Amino acid sequence: LIKIQTKSILAKTAVVISLCALCSSVFAAPTSKGLTKSEELYPQGWTVGDQIKFKKGTTASLNDNGAVISGVLASDTYLRPQGWQRIINDYYFVSAYTNRSPFFPRYYRYWNNNSTYNIALSSYGHIRYKGGTAVTFSEQGTVLNGTIADETTVGLGSEKYGFIAFKSGTILDFYNDGAVKKGTLAEDTKLRPVGWQNNAVDMENAGFVEFKGKSIVSFTPDGEVTNCTVKEPLKWKDNGVEIELPGGSIINFTEQGA
């Protein structure tokens, strides 16, 4: 009987140890690596062994495989954002110099009077992220958030028409499904806030509200505004009561009102 009980206890102990080991591997916390020099590292989620250079004097967050979850770029770098399928202006220009007139049938060329010409090449869903700023990679290897170096136009809805230009030098943040989560408007833009169906007073505008350029905007996964700066005074409902929101103010929108 004692032997049986001992074996039972040992078996239970082994199970507990195995479960603990499994949990520790599944829920392993990211580790930090201080960079004493600019260093090339592998981002998480990449299936090809390309490296990105991260900036000296910063700290990179690594997963349990030693791949980068987040870090500070050493220089401007083209990367694919999480919502890369929705990127509209996915091209970039390169310059070339010649004394003759070559023919490139596949690419658009902008000519000037000198021996210099520019060619627009597809970036295949990549956008340029600003050097000296932090980026965070998803488990698929795309960028969840980072500072864009150029003005970037993104489709707002996955199955609906509509595009937004986001300001260069600002942070662009994506949901895991690729929808835009947060960014800075490059220009005045008309968008629909959360709860517009029940709270918009003037339906002549079909629920659209004009938001101020260069202001930070936050979206639901469906592309409705939860927070931004309204350009003009706005008549809206809050818990069924009609109110007027001051122009130039940051407004938080909910299903119940503002």
Predicted features and spans:
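Terminal low-complexity interaction tails
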Residues: L1-I2, T254
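Bacterial N-terminal signal peptides that target proteins for export
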Residues: I2-V15
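Glycine/tyrosine- and acidic-biased, solvent-exposed loop/turn segments at the edges of beta-strands
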Residues: A28-A258
